[in-house]
UniProtKB/Swiss-Prot annotation:
Binding site for S-adenosyl-L-methionine: 75, 100, 127, 149
Reaction(s) the record says it catalyses: guanosine(46) in tRNA + S-adenosyl-L-methionine = N(7)-methylguanosine(46) in tRNA + S-adenosyl-L-homocysteine
Keyword tRNA processing found: yes
One Gene Ontology MF term: tRNA (guanine(46)-N7)-methyltransferase activity
Record-listed E.C. numbers: 2.1.1.33
SUPFAM superfamilies the UniProt entry points to: S-adenosyl-L-methionine-dependent methyltransferases
Keyword line: Methyltransferase, S-adenosyl-L-methionine, Transferase, tRNA processing
Gene Ontology annotations for the cellular component aspect, listed alphabetically: tRNA methyltransferase complex
Residue positions of the active site: 149
Classification via Pfam families: Methyltransf_4 (PF02390)
Protein family per UniProt: Belongs to the class I-like SAM-binding methyltransferase superfamily. TrmB family.
Name of the protein in question: tRNA (guanine-N(7)-)-methyltransferase
Organism: Acinetobacter baylyi (strain ATCC 33305 / BD413 / ADP1)
Amino acid sequence: MSHTKIMSTDQLETQITELDNLPEHREIVTFMRRSAPLNTSQRSALEQYQDLILEYPVGDLRQHFEHPEHPLTVEIGFGMGRSLVLMAKAHPERNFVGIEVHVPGIAQCVYEAGMAGLKNLRVLDADAIQVLREMPDNSINCVQLYFPDPWQKKRHFKRRFVIHERMQLVEQKLELGGTFHAATDWEPYAEWMLDVLDNRPALENLAGKGNSYPRPEWRPQTKFERRGIESGHKINDFIFKKIGS
């Protein structure tokens, strides 16, 4: 029986540094792939519910649904997918695409979505930035970023998803009136997010400039959120609406 080797933190740090030093590594990514074994149900789910898994490149995400005219929500980094599945169950009038690079998370998400018989959820193993670039402008109703890697070390700040360059791309793809919803339990990243987002002229802070949004009841609690609460961390939600181009 083969065993999947899981990288230590030190090994990940070394890999990140080596990637940054490669001359051909021009694109800064916001994620690192981490290996982990699949359980039996996850392995079978990848085959049984493969119709829920999109293969990159995918083009316009809306075309992969039975009702492409329904509002589209894109979640970037859905972890194990429980909250994404719950949202798709609660909102059959919307289409959901989850983008994740952690294979066990993808497998668990399609297992739960498949068992629930969901038709309005698809998942994708890809770099979210590349996926967004290939989407038509003004085509997404909501982009969700829940408890992303805060990249705590200063030299890794460029990897944070919420920076001006990446938010410009998000704005281009959001339809007018569409929203960007982020949540984090890491206070320094929350302050960073607010500083970036409050200074985007095309976005309006629905909680008022300088404020975080009251925790929405409709956002299911995630595993990372529970861990943050158990550690005594404050949970910050930010919802920004596109008001211009």
